[in-house]
Curated annotation (Swiss-Prot):
Cofactor(s) essential for the protein: FAD
A GO biological-process term: glutathione metabolic process
InterPro entries reported for this sequence: FAD/NAD-bd_sf (IPR036188), FAD/NAD-binding_dom (IPR023753), FAD/NAD-linked_Rdtase_dimer_sf (IPR016156), GSHR/TRXR-like (IPR046952), Pyr_nuc-diS_OxRdtase (IPR001100), Pyr_nucl-diS_OxRdtase_dimer (IPR004099), Pyr_OxRdtase_I_AS (IPR012999), Trypnth_redctse (IPR001864)
Domain of life: Eukaryota
Binding, FAD: 35-52
Record function comment: Trypanothione is the parasite analog of glutathione; this enzyme is the equivalent of glutathione reductase.
Family, per entry: Belongs to the class-I pyridine nucleotide-disulfide oxidoreductase family.
Subcellular location: Cytoplasm
Name of this protein: Trypanothione reductase
SUPFAM superfamilies: FAD/NAD(P)-binding domain (SSF51905), FAD/NAD-linked reductases, dimerisation (C-terminal) domain (SSF55424), Nucleotide-binding domain (SSF51971)
Additional detail: The active site is a redox-active disulfide bond.
Main location: cytoplasm
Tagged with keyword Zinc-finger: no
Length: 491
């Protein structure tokens, strides 16, 4: 049976666009990509390019960069730059306008891609499954809303990403999410970021850098330590440095109720009995975006928080339906979604050469202030998987901060190895340039680098990165899952 389309992609994010473009260009397939709007901003906020381009990585990195100038200006005095720092203040509106201009240009480039690519078409609306080979495009997420068109297809790719969710407490409708934070008219004077993940931590840095005079930023997290899943010592050091930067990190704390004050600000009740007023409360809690896709109509199985269940090749419980990216809740990173999209459509489905994305040793970054770069296992993960593990640790004050006046800004590097053969299992860094350094480290680790390879490499001086080549003595070990200062002599 001949169908109207070879492939329908739900979601025009990085992974979906990679898959759709490859199918159309490399394999000459007829492809339809469905998403809610073409250009960023209200009402849907997300558009061509997905979360990353519109309300994620790209605009957030621009805003973090802007926020870093607060410290650079303050620290420049030690290097001889004389100015009236008290009179300097950031202009939030200028930042947002500049950010919007960049995002607009990316949206336009994707529009041109659709216009210039034979066999690739964009369909605006909310896509949902009618059955395993039919996608309906509606006016809204409401399953009873008007149907704009119906797409008949051989294959379906679900690439709808993740989406902010609510707390589920009274008054949480008064809160904004990280999506709306990109479109605030003014920087809040009193800001609360709710969550302990990278989005909350990154936005805390942004709002701290752009807060009006006399303002403050709080970050509250229900757990003991922010950034669960990252290296423990890096998390502790970042928490300390955030505090030194003026951000109050409040752990084991969660809002239980939010009410509106007469002046429009938010009155927040916390689980420890305290109460506080904030101009804005931002929720940074995300879940896979699958709730409105009507996956049950095609028999597609989902798991915790609506994550689409897939095998190693990104195939769902239905043979002709695949899913990639955040909606599968595997490794929720844009480059991973792009790789998954290429593997699924370029090679597995239309290429006839099944290939799975390797989700191990994926380098990533947290653009906090200061930032984190990480790749591979934490020491706890390594200790569960290997009999003997060595942990190399170093922290130091980068050269510039001997003059800048910010000696609290330590650079931390931690290397985790399999002690039996020296293989580098994980590298974790905190400090300026850590995200740039970790990319090269990730390549080394993917090639199977050993700690001896690091030791035999001549470092670039003077840099923070050269410390990777100088860490020759383990700080401690793990043996049979337990931390020890030295290994048993019989090993």
């Amino acid at each position: 049976m001949s169908r109207a389309y070879d492939l329908v992609v739900l979601g025009a994010g990085s992974g979906g666009l990679e898959a759709g473009w490859n199918a159309a260009v490399t394999h000459k397939k007829k492809v339809a990509v469905v998403d809610v709007q073409a250009t960023h901003g209200p009402p849907a906020l997300v558009a061509l390019g997905g979360t990353c381009v519109n309300v994620g990585c790209v605009p957030k990195k621009l805003m973090v960069t802007g926020a870093q100038y607060m410290d650079l200006i303050r620290e420049s005095g030690g290097f001889g730059w004389e100015m009236d720092r008290e009179s300097l203040c950031p202009n939030w509106k200028t930042l947002i306008a500049a950010k919007n201009k960049v995002v607009n240009s990316i949206n336009e480039s994707y529009k041109s891609m659709f216009a210039d690519t034979e066999g690739l078409s964009f369909h605006m609306g909310f896509g949902a499954l009618q059955d395993a080979h039919t996608v309906v495009v509606r006016k809204s997420e409401d399953p009873h809303s008007d149907v704009l068109e119906t797409l008949d297809t051989e294959y379906i790719l679900i690439a709808t990403g993740s989406w902010p969710t609510r707390l589920g407490v009274p008054g949480d409708e008064f809160c904004i999410t990280s999506n709306e934070a990109f479109y605030l008219e003014d920087a809040p004077k009193r800001m609360l970021c709710v969550g302990g993940g990278y989005i909350a931590v990154e936005f805390a840095g942004i709002f701290n850098g752009y807060k009006p005079c006399g303002g403050y930023v709080d970050l509250c997290y229900r757990g003991d330590l922010i950034l669960r899943g990252f290296d423990t010592e890096v998390r502790k050091s970042l928490t300390k440095q955030l505090g030194a930067n003026g951000i109050r990190v409040r752990t084991n704390l969660n809002p239980t109720k939010i009410t509106k004050n007469e002046d429009g600000s938010n009155h927040v009740h916390f689980n420890d009995g305290t109460e506080e007023d904030y101009d804005q409360v931002m929720l940074a809690i995300g879940v896979p975006r699958s709730q409105a896709l009507q996956l049950d109509k095609a028999g597609v199985r989902t798991g915790k928080n609506g994550a689409v269940q897939v095998d190693a090749y990104s195939k769902t419980s239905v043979d002709n339906i695949y899913a990639i990216g955040d909606v599968t809740n595997r490794v929720m990173l844009t480059p991973v979604a792009i790789n998954e999209g290429a593997c699924v459509l370029l090679e597995t489905v239309f290429g006839g050469k099944p290939r799975a994305t390797d989700h191990t040793k994926v380098a990533c970054a947290v653009f906090s202030i200061p930032p984190i770069g990480t790749c591979g296992m934490t020491e706890e993960e390594a200790a569960k998987n290997y009999e003997t593990v060595a942990v190399y640790a170093s922290s130091f004050t980068p050269l510039m901060h001997n003059i800048s006046g910010s000696k609290h800004k330590e650079f931390m590097i931690r290397i985790i190895t399999n002690e039996s053969n020296g293989e580098v299992l994980g590298v974790h860094m905190l400090g300026d340039s850590a995200p740039e350094i970790i990319q090269s480290v990730g390549i080394c680790m993917k090639m199977g680098a050993k700690i001896s390879d690091f030791h035999s490499t001549i470092g670039v001086h003077p840099t923070s990165a050269e410390e990777l080549c100088s860490m020759r003595t383990p700080a401690y070990f793990y043996e049979s899952g337990k931390r020890v200062e030295k290994l048993s002599s019989n090993l």
